[in-house]
């Protein structure tokens, strides 16, 4: 054994060939600060070996290196800029020394090689991969950019266009694509990976492969003519501006850095990467996006822990076909759980099956499946007008009309047709689960399961625990949601649960602004362009359905009369009374016509102004700051109340529910991350300016206490150890 660290070891393999093996405790390898230091020490040992002829890098895990240790990021990002820059210089010196070894090097890459893992293998001369490879640089999705030389080596290896596509989008690619663009040199079966890598090394050692020529382009300026450079970088900047926008500085910074570094050799190019990385790491956007990643891991880990003792349902059923029922049936069948889809009429069943078939055909068109797979999946969805097969189902989700009487009747009838241990769930969006449970003989086997539309795209499923829902019931429903590829978050019961409970105060803020003379178009523009929502409130209401919102608004007002009962007729009332239900009937805040792809396209409609004039004061201008404050304060206050009342368990789960269920702008990180970034005292000052607008603007006492003591909702993060302590090699 030449060297042994906590996460890697170095040993002789054969006749002058050494192997450096990543083998961290636990299930995966991460390129954390300690591993970077160990790698430096191991390379130091290699540099002393006079009989070294070649080096093979590999992993003892199912994946090569999944990336940097993101749990370290928030503390690293608090390190002063000079110290962070110093540590990056140290880390890059390690990879440079790996790249500069006087012998050929190869990485035998299996599974994931992401972020720092990808940057590590870019420093070797050759890369051989297994068919399950996923390799790429996802850093821009975390609000940063590659910091271990990825933005320098990848463009010089692949050419600017392919590298920009991966780096700016934070993409990873599979084995076939990696081979095609030159990111790996070969793909072999897993059992032949090490032997194949040794064979390549022997060819390089014997002079059959010119490893020095292979290495050289990574050390030099990027080989692009002036015209090629102008075209590549201009197109890339245009695409990034269009897709990422101003709220996500990392992608455009990465493109500009690669452009600026193109004319330099490795050392100067790495210095430019360093200078760009450090300021990005200190942005609120990076902290928010890293926070989302960590919250996502927390939520998924919690679901895994919750379901460890239950069996995932093997047969499901959906009550109520149509678009929603068809979407749920498709998602279940697509992920391998056969489903019975029941309705009371053929027309709805046809609609549900058509929806499922349409979604499968899209997968076929994209090349994700072939005709055989399509036929196989669709055959596991069984449409029925009766309860045939319900005696075999493990779980039933009801997705009928949002009417408590209808839902109770359907659930009570279904309970008589299923086994004693079958779980029932309701896909209600607002009706309290404990109320629906009153119709059942086995309320302990019942809970809420709130999907979001469109089901196949929206990652969140709210799992609602009723007063009598058992832990086993919740665990089984969480297991099914996870199997369907969704992110389940368990909440306690109340009108609207969590997501809709906090959404309707936001809509109330919108209604009050319109009442006071604001223009709905300006509100939408501000909330989209400035705050960053994917849709402004007017457009969102049109998509959700004015009739749906009108009904839900009444349910919420009955549930929370003190805050949500209004004493005036609002824009939603006016549009509803005029039979303007949004996109579903082509008339809402806008008029809708189908474009060439059959998608609804909004157009101005003068009739809306007349309708809104009846429920509004004369038009006046509002500043962007006031619009944002008046829209967000009611929502954030309600989010805080939900935490204080135990409706949602943690700030992390609340923020993920907002991001995954409502599209809360990820660069803000969610309501609690936004609050912490803004500061609770500053938020309180802002909210107090608008408390005259009513109870929705009154800040909860718990948040007032936070403001008094300047306490954040997320645990404070300590800066990483001084760089001198980090740098141990």
From Swiss-Prot:
Coiled coil: none annotated. GO terms for cellular component: fatty acid beta-oxidation multienzyme complex. Residues 311-729 are annotated as: 3-hydroxyacyl-CoA dehydrogenase. NAD(+) binds at residues 324, 343, 400-402, 407, 429, 453. Signal peptide: none annotated. It comes from the Bacteria. GO terms for biological process: fatty acid beta-oxidation. Pathway: Lipid metabolism; fatty acid beta-oxidation. Residues 708-729 are annotated as: Disordered. Its EC number is 4.2.1.17, 5.1.2.3, 5.3.3.8, 1.1.1.35. Substrate binds at residues 296, 500, 660. One of its GO terms (molecular function) is 3-hydroxybutyryl-CoA epimerase activity. Residues 1-189 are annotated as: Enoyl-CoA hydratase/isomerase. It catalyses: a (3S)-3-hydroxyacyl-CoA + NAD(+) = a 3-oxoacyl-CoA + NADH + H(+); a (3S)-3-hydroxyacyl-CoA = a (2E)-enoyl-CoA + H2O; a 4-saturated-(3S)-3-hydroxyacyl-CoA = a (3E)-enoyl-CoA + H2O; (3S)-3-hydroxybutanoyl-CoA = (3R)-3-hydroxybutanoyl-CoA. The active site is at 450 (for 3-hydroxyacyl-coa dehydrogenase activity). In the N-terminal section; belongs to the enoyl-CoA hydratase/isomerase family. Involved in the aerobic and anaerobic degradation of long-chain fatty acids via beta-oxidation cycle. Catalyzes the formation of 3-oxoacyl-CoA from enoyl-CoA via L-3-hydroxyacyl-CoA. It can also use D-3-hydroxyacyl-CoA and cis-3-enoyl-CoA as substrate. This is Fatty acid oxidation complex subunit alpha. It comes from Escherichia coli (strain K12). The gene is fadB.
